[in-house]
Regions:
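A general structural signal for well-ordered alpha-helical segments in protein cores
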Residues: 23, 43, 59-62, 75, ...
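Short, well-structured N-terminal submotif of metal-dependent ribonuclease cores
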Residues: 1-38, 50-61, 130-132
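A generic structural signal for short hydrophobic patches within well-formed alpha-helices
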Residues: 13-14, 43, 79, 116-117
Length: 132
């Protein structure tokens, strides 16, 4: 049986990268590279966060890793689906693009972002209020 496709949201990448308690739980859920879909908007968000938090060299290494996964560019079909999901679920633009990418590709979304709570096709690993 083939492992399911998963889109890993920026919030989950960050928890995994910093090695938090939540990140350790997530590491068991992280897909192999061939099942890991990476929207280009996630690469943008990750790059911004990484350069700010750890510097360009480590940012380049993580982005290089994401490029070994299945990178999914924003195309018209995903953009229009994102617009629908934005309106329907009141998501921020980047969140709508990430969620639309997962829905368009028939993948599960792995996230720590409570904005996705209750949406179909989402595996939410919510941050404990003590983690904040």
């Amino acid at each position: 049986m083939t492992a399911p496709l998963r889109v890993v949201d920026t919030s989950a990448w960050i928890e995994w990268l910093i090695g938090s308690a939540l990140g350790k739980k997530l590491s068991e859920q992280f897909p192999d590279k061939l099942q890991c879909l990476v929207p280009t908007i996630v690469q943008l968000e990750l790059s911004k966060w990484l350069v700010r938090e750890v510097g360009e060299e480590q940012a380049d290494q993580v982005i290089a890793y994401t490029q070994k996964c299945v990178v999914v560019p924003l195309d018209t079909a995903i953009a229009l689906l994102a617009a629908d999901l934005y309106r329907e679920h009141k998501l921020a633009t980047a969140d709508a693009i990430v969620y639309a990418t997962a829905r368009h590709r028939g993948a599960e979304l792995l996230t720590c972002d409570a904005h996705f709570d209750g949406l179909p096709g989402v595996a939410l690993y919510a941050k404990d209020h003590r983690d904040l």
